[in-house]
């Protein structure tokens, strides 16, 4: 267990240079609560603290986002202070303000060795090692959702309800497409051989990556909620028609095939979390429902559940709206135990491994892991 945390104070010099000074300080020397969650409580759920860290955010600042990209954990404050941490040990890779205050950092994505962010009408490319801005291009229109790209092009959804395809090296527009119903494009996936986008009218459309040619289209009865999740040949998405869908991409030429749809008890507003064997769906006003990935059958529900934190073997770790960790057995479809997470207000959904990442608004971040 890591018994010390890194306390960092940040300064912005007149020239805009960010400087971090780092001091090691033991937990025992600090007043107040030592831990984000008590180790004694975690022991009850067969969990332990792998590391805990404190970000150098101001007293008037609060942490708002926590998410995983590759092998890094990213934390973003309401004043656009962005920290990149090694998610194995909690060490900071970089910490800096990446956009002016008041201009939200949206849709941070990793493509090869570049972080891509959207800020208003700008596409910003950031070095993931230093946090330095490599490029920034004003594309001349408001961007409605996170960017997607492949080796040749950027794919940007505009507020004008068009998907704009720009050449990657110089951001020159090559062509644009729209759906017949003129609905807003809400998410985009870019591969080398095809592009898929979803709309607020419920359309899921695949086109050629380099020309305005449609390959196939699937229409749900309600708008697509959140981004589409691609897992192998399968697409998983939630619709405001209350259904979770699995659509497979099959054959040559490529075509779509509905594998299953699962009707929930509410109008959905978030994308599902997809792991190796289970699809987890948040249902507003109800909780989190687990669905068998292969057949689309319900496994269990956690009333009041908010999101999946992680999965370990046959166990799922779900955080609830009232800040409780609930551990579910996916095989026996029953609750195993729960832990008070009263101090936890921010978390990352981890579908890659069994580590749990939690935080509070003051910038304390902890990594938990199951005890074997």
Label each PLM-derived region with a short phrase.
Residues 3-13:
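Bacterial N-terminal signal peptides that target proteins for export
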Residues 13-19:
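Sec-dependent N-terminal signal peptides
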Residues 20-27:
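C-terminal segment of classical bacterial N-terminal signal peptides
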Residues 30-33, 59-79, 100-124, 137-164, ...:
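Repeat-blade elements of multi-bladed beta-propeller folds
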Residues 36-60:
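A short helix->beta-strand "capping" segment at the edge of beta-propeller domains
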Residues 51-56, 91-97, 132-137, 172-178, ...:
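A short beta-strand motif characteristic of beta-propeller blades
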Residues 77-88:
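Beta-propeller domains
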Residues 86-89, 127-130, 167-171, 208-212, ...:
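Short loop/turn segments that connect beta-strands within beta-propeller blades
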């Amino acid at each position: 267990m890591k018994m010390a945390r890194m306390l960092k104070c940040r300064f912005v010099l007149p020239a805009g240079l960010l400087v971090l000074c780092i001091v090691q300080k033991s937990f025992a020397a600090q007043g107040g609560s030592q831990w984000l969650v008590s180790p004694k409580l975690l022991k009850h759920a067969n969990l332990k603290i792998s590391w805990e860290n404190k970000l150098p955010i101001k007293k008037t600042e609060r942490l708002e986002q926590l998410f995983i990209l590759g092998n890094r954990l990213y934390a973003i404050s309401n004043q656009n202070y962005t920290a990149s941490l090694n998610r194995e040990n909690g060490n900071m890779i970089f910490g800096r303000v990446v956009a002016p205050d008041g201009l939200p950092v949206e849709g941070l994505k990793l493509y090869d060795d570049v972080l891509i962010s959207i800020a208003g009408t700008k596409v910003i490319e950031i070095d993931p090692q230093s946090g330095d801005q490599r490029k920034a291009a004003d594309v001349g229109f408001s961007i409605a959702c996170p960017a997607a790209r492949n080796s040749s092009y950027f794919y940007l959804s505009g507020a004008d309800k068009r998907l704009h395809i720009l050449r990657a090296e110089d951001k020159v527009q090559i062509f644009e497409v729209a759906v017949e119903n003129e609905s807003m494009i809400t998410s985009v996936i870019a591969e080398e051989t095809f592009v898929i986008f979803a709309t607020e009218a419920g359309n899921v459309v695949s086109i050629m990556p380099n020309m305005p040619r449609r390959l196939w289209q699937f229409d749900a009865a309600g708008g697509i909620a959140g981004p589409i999740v691609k897992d192998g040949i399968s697409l998983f998405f939630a619709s405001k028609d209350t259904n979770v869908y699995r659509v497979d991409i099959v054959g040559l030429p490529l075509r779509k095939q509905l594998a299953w749809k699962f009707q929930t008890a509410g109008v959905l507003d978030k994308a599902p979390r997809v792991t190796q064997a289970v699809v987890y769906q948040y249902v507003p006003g109800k909780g989190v429902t687990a669905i068998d990935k292969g057949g689309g059958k319900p496994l269990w529900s956690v009333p009041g559940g908010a999101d999946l934190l992680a999965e370990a073997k046959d166990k799922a770790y779900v955080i609830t709206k009232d800040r409780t960790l609930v551990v579910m057995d996916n095989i026996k479809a029953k609750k195993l135990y729960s832990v008070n997470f009263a101090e936890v207000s921010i978390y990352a959904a981890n579908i890659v491994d069994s580590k749990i990442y939690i935080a509070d608004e003051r910038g304390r971040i902890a990594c938990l892991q199951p005890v074997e």
